[in-house]
């Protein structure tokens, strides 16, 4: 049997027999690593340590020290849950139970559970873990598998789809429990240090609302009790910062049933924040040489066929029949921008050409996947597309990265960066891919940006740089992407005249500074816990007259601060109640005025940190507001600086 070459994470290569397992590869590297091997990652896929490698591949060995080990442990925790469930509810039908970032979920049918049942199941899970039951992989024939699941249509569905080419079929066994599964898993249940069941929700089989409704149970799993306790504390804080809760408290947005799922309504205060975000993005775009464009909400499907979206994305599109002609609400803005570029003749001297648009798009996500502002049907992208020569990629991506980091700095956000390179199936020649990836690496390294390399994770039409925002609680959220595109210019036959006086195809670069306004708004609500910086706050200053006697002075102050969003609290409340209301609404500044302030024509300033300064000259405070706003400082700092 011929040898194959496996490439290790450090780039070194190892020659092994063509049927070598992941564990064999580990022992070739060293006996200590071989003994510690839990699983492996082969060409990006997490697999069992006993999985054979038959072709040249990239191989990563997974041990208890690896990041991937957590997914293995949590997958095993899902099996412990399923075993405990079947002991308590033998008639329950198991479907799928994948790992998540903090634990797992398991979808089940034919059983009614409520939150009170979780404690009983959790107690049984702990008994299974304490028993330290070995977890082993076994293979069974397809006939045996179908016979085993003759009363479980969900497992039969898996056998007919994901496992259609498997014979024999992989199962994992632990004592009296077995499950159709590819793994990998830990060696025994005792390796799972700490678990808890979190909550129950509903889900559709396959995420399709036309299928059966299932019961979904979420759980958390960690190596130690201390890690679990830390997670539960973070989870508690996250619930307090939930953007849906704060959005309702501050009257920022709503998603009522009558409007339809995933279709948010922005209330006046929410729209004020979005306007500020849009204005900031617009200023960065204009400064970087982008020109504003606008495209309609729908196009004839001929455009989507030319762009390739109709072929690959039609199930996620909203289609309309208009006078016997088919139209589609746009799921993306890029075909419209490519069409604008195509309306002109371009020379190499004109490039790069840069467009930007706050473009509303529509994507038909499954209803079960919709969640607040993070997953919606209708959302707006601060979309930018630029068209350049291949040799201009590095300079243009550098400018985009500068703008993205300006956004991060402005909002006090951290980001994790990843470079995703050419996948197995791609369009475009070797030379243009190698040139593009080299230029992207050069940008990242010249700016000293730490990044993860994700081989093969690029889009089929070009490599990309992905950003994940990290908020105040250390959680990561999908952020901007800088995506090179060799496909759309080809589909639209976009050209420019080169120095050699012949036609050349430009490279298209997709980029957004926020990602989408909806998701970024969600991140900001939770990151700031509703305590927005002055420049974003919908109500920037609240004037609190002690009595109606000061209302005239209050209106004079409001007029002098007319370049800010100022309100007057004129309800017949005590001063204490007025202050509490402003605090609850996270207003950055309060101006308190009584008879003394009226007589001296001064103000008392209180910030939301409950600090106060008296005898303040209004013009001094006004000047400070301008400075704090223009510099987009994150916290109200008048008291600190005066």
UniProtKB/Swiss-Prot annotation:
Q: According to its UniProt record, where is this protein mainly located?
A: cytoplasm
Q: What class of enzyme is it?
A: ligase
Where is the protein situated, by its record's location annotation?
Answer: Cytoplasm
Q: Among the entry's GO cellular component annotations, what is one?
A: cytoplasm
| InterPro entries xref list | aa-tRNA-synt_IIb (IPR002314), aa-tRNA-synth_II (IPR006195), aa-tRNA-synth_II/BPL/LPL (IPR045864), Anticodon-bd (IPR004154), Anticodon-bd_dom_sf (IPR036621), Beta-grasp_dom_sf (IPR012675), TGS (IPR004095), TGS-like (IPR012676)
Reaction(s) catalysed (UniProt annotation): tRNA(Thr) + L-threonine + ATP = L-threonyl-tRNA(Thr) + AMP + diphosphate + H(+)
Q: Which cofactor does it need?
A: Zn(2+)
Domain (TGS) ranges: 1-63
Q: How is the cofactor bound?
A: Binds 1 zinc ion per subunit.
| Swiss-Prot/TrEMBL GO biological process terms | threonyl-tRNA aminoacylation
The record's region (Catalytic) falls at: 242-533
Mind listing the GO molecular function terms for this protein? aminoacyl-tRNA deacylase activity; ATP binding; metal ion binding; threonine-tRNA ligase activity; tRNA binding
Q: Which UniProt keywords apply?
A: Aminoacyl-tRNA synthetase, ATP-binding, Cytoplasm, Ligase, Metal-binding, Nucleotide-binding, Protein biosynthesis, RNA-binding, tRNA-binding, Zinc
Q: Which residues bind Zn(2+)?
A: 334, 385, 510
- Per the UniProt entry, the Enzyme Commission number(s) are 6.1.1.3
Q: Which Pfam families match?
A: HGTP_anticodon (PF03129), TGS (PF02824), tRNA-synt_2b (PF00587), tRNA_SAD (PF07973)
Subunit organization: Homodimer.
What's its job? Catalyzes the attachment of threonine to tRNA(Thr) in a two-step reaction: L-threonine is first activated by ATP to form Thr-AMP and then transferred to the acceptor end of tRNA(Thr).
- What family name appears in the similarity comment? Belongs to the class-II aminoacyl-tRNA synthetase family.
PANTHER family reported for this sequence: THREONINE--TRNA LIGASE, CHLOROPLASTIC_MITOCHONDRIAL 2, THREONINE-TRNA LIGASE
Task: Write down what this protein is called.
Answer: Threonine--tRNA ligase
């Amino acid at each position: 049997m011929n040898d194959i070459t496996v490439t290790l994470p450090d780039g070194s290569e190892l020659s092994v027999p063509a049927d070598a397992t992941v564990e064999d590869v580990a022992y070739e590297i060293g006996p200590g690593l071989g003994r510690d091997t839990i699983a492996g990652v082969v060409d990006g896929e997490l697999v069992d340590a006993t999985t054979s490698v038959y072709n040249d591949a990239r191989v990563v060995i997974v041990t208890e020290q690896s990041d991937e080990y957590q997914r293995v442990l949590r997958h095993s925790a899902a099996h412990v849950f399923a075993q405990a469930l079947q002991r308590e509810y033998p008639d329950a039908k198991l479907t799928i139970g994948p790992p998540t970032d903090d634990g797992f979920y398991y979808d089940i049918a034919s059983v009614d559970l409520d939150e009170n049942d979780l404690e009983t199941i959790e107690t049984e899970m702990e008994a299974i873990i304490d028993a330290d039951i070995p977890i082993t992989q076994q293979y069974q024939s397809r006939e045996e598998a179908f016979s085993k699941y003759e009363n479980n249509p969900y497992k039969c569905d898996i056998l007919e789809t994901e496992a259609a080419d498997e014979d024999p079929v992989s199962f994992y066994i632990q004592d009296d429990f077995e499950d159709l599964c590819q793994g990998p898993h830990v060696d025994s249940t005792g390796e799972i240090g700490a678990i808890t069941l979190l909550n129950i929700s509903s889900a559709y089989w396959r995420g399709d609302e036309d299928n059966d409704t299932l019961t979904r149970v979420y759980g958390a799993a960690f190596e130690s009790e201390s890690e679990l306790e830390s997670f539960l504390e973070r989870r508690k804080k996250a619930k307090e910062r939930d953007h849906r809760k704060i959005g309702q408290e501050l009257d920022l947005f709503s998603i009522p049933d009558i409007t339809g799922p995933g279709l948010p309504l922005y209330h006046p205060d929410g729209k004020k924040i979005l306007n500020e975000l849009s204005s900031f993005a617009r200023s960065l775009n204009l400064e970087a040489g982008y020109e504003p464009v606008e495209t309609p909400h729908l196009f004839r499907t001929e455009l989507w066929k030319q762009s390739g979206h109709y072929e690959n994305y039609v199930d996620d599109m909203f289609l309309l029949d208009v006078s016997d002609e088919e139209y589609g609400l746009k799921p993306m803005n890029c075909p419209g921008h490519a069409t604008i570029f195509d309306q002109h003749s371009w020379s190499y001297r004109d490039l790069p050409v840069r467009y930007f648009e706050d473009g509303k798009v529509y994507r038909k996500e499954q209803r079960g996947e919709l969640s607040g502002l993070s997953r919606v049907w209708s959302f707006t992208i601060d979309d930018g597309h630029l068209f350049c020569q291949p040799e201009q990629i590095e300079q243009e991506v550098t400018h985009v990265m500068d703008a993205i980091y300006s956004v991060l700095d402005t909002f006090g956000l951290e980001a994790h960066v990843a470079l995703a390179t050419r996948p197995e199936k791609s369009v475009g020649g070797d030379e243009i891919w190698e040139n593009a990836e080299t230029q992207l690496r050069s940008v990242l390294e010249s700016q000293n940006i730490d990044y993860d390399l994700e081989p093969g994770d690029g889009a089929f039409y070009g490599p990309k740089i992905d950003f994940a925002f990290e908020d105040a609680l250390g959680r990561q959220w999908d952020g901007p992407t800088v995506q090179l595109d060799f496909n759309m210019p080809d589909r639209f036959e976009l050209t420019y005249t080169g120095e050699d006086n012949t036609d050349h195809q430009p490279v298209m670069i997709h980029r957004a500074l926020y990602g989408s306004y909806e998701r970024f708004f969600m991140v900001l609500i939770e990151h700031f816990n509703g305590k927005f910086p002055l420049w974003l706050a919908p109500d920037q200053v609240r004037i609190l007259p002690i009595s109606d006697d000061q209302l005239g002075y209050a209106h004079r102050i409001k007029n002098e601060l007319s370049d800010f969003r100022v309100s007057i609290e004129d309800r017949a409340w005590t001063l204490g109640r007025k202050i509490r209301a402003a605090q609850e609404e996270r207003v950055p500044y309060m101006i308190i005025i009584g008879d003394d302030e009226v007589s001296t024509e001064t103000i008392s300033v209180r910030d939301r940190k409950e600090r106060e300064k008296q005898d303040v000259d209004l013009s001094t405070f006004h000047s400070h507001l301008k400075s704090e706003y223009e510099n987009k400082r994150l916290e109200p700092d008048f008291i600190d600086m005066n």
